[in-house]
């Protein structure tokens, strides 16, 4: 029997690559033919399963400190894992986070670097974020966004949550108090109005726009396509 092992990570325990390797070894030991196909849904591990990093650049972390963020570019295609620039782990977890101040600016810097380096297709995995800024930080780093015309910006989402709901659903996991959740909810609601007024995109109606604290919705407002992270990775690695 031939088995394709397509496992995602066990968060906090083992990476997708480690898990698939262990399962393949066990199957081979049992006399089966097994092939490893590590998977990701757009969250942590997205970069690793799509070839791994071949560049590292210094960008702005979620709370303003500089961080070294790995990413990948090959043949005009860039792969960015937002957690590498704006992730909760970068600030030491929810207890050390400032959920109101946390910004996606560094993720925007990575996207900008990718395009400046020749990428015409940019895959952004969103998940594991420290942020609930609705993507406004990233958009500030990308300004002026007109220079990204002709670039395919694709956001791999790991949730279906809509934009304004991101605060209520995920902000408590990032250290937000009930009062801060209410503040962040109101901020996202206002941002949705601003995005519609400025770009004509109704981000609140887009499934998955609440991913990474609304980063997905912010990027959608400038033309990004939001897709299922699992389906994107499956397509990219030829899992069929």
Model-inferred region functions:
Residues 1-240:
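N-terminal loops that bind phosphate or other acidic moieties
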């Amino acid at each position: 029997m031939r088995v394709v092992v397509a496992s995602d990570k066990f968060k906090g325990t083992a990476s997708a690559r480690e898990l698939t390797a262990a399962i393949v070894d066990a199957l081979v030991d049992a006399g089966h033919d097994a092939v490893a196909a590590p998977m990701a849904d757009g969250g942590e591990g997205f970069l690793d399963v799509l070839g791994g990093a071949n560049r590292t650049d210094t960008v702005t972390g979620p709370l303003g400190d500089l961080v070294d963020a790995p990413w990948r570019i090959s043949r005009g295609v860039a792969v960015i894992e937002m957690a590498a620039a704006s992730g909760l782990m970068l600030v030491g977890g929810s207890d050390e986070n400032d959920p109101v101040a946390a910004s996606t600016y560094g993720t925007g810097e990575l996207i900008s670097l990718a395009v400046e380096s020749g990428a015409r297709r940019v895959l952004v995995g969103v998940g594991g974020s420290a942020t609930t800024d609705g993507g406004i930080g990233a958009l500030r780093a990308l300004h002026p966004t007109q220079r990204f015309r002709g670039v395919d910006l694709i956001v791999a989402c790991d949730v279906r949550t809509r934009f304004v709901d991101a605060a209520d659903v995920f902000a408590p996991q990032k250290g937000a108090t009930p009062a801060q959740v209410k503040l962040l909810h109101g901020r996202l609601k206002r941002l949705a109005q601003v995005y519609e007024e400025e770009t004509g995109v109704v981000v609140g109606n887009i499934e998955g726009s609440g991913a990474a604290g609304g980063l997905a919705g912010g990027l959608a407002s400038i033309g990004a396509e939001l897709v299922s992270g699992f389906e994107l990775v499956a397509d990219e690695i030829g899992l069929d």
